[in-house]
Amino acid sequence: ALILSGGVAVENPKPLKKNLRKIKKISRQLDKRVHARNKQERLEGKKKSNNYRKLSVRLSNAQRKVANIRRDFTQKVTTILTTHYAHIALEDLNVKGMVRNHRLAQSVSDVAFGELCRQIEYKSMLNGIKVLKADRFYPSSKTCSVCGHIKQDLRLSDRTYHCAKCGAIIDRDYNASLNLL
């Protein structure tokens, strides 16, 4: 989720998660249809069946729909951010490392964080907006935005930040956004 300075959270539509069942179903159906499965069969002239062609069009349409939803969301959000805000702060996340983790890979790819950052940087350059990149090792989520106390034992599953020093209770992502600005 993107957290704006007013505390508003912009949720990603997660198009792949919503359409994954449909894509998998079409892929399974496609594998059952007659087509050349290797180079030898292609050389022998084994052709694709009409149903194979129809299903491959359905599969590409479903995949195109996911890509279009993702692109539309990214374009609209980056346009709003770069036209309404004077400063934008981004965390320099290790997206490649996050994609290597098999538990995070699909959801990180579905968000398209790299493309979002690239478009924010591009559009902010056009509009003359300053983009701040925070170091990936800066403890923005672990630092209290009220008193500055750093909480060492904050897990990813903890969605609210509870400060032991001043007693502040705040949403984890909103706390990080306040610390980045």
Locations of regions flagged by a protein language model:
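Positively charged, helix-rich recognition surfaces that bind polyanionic ligands
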Residues: 1-181
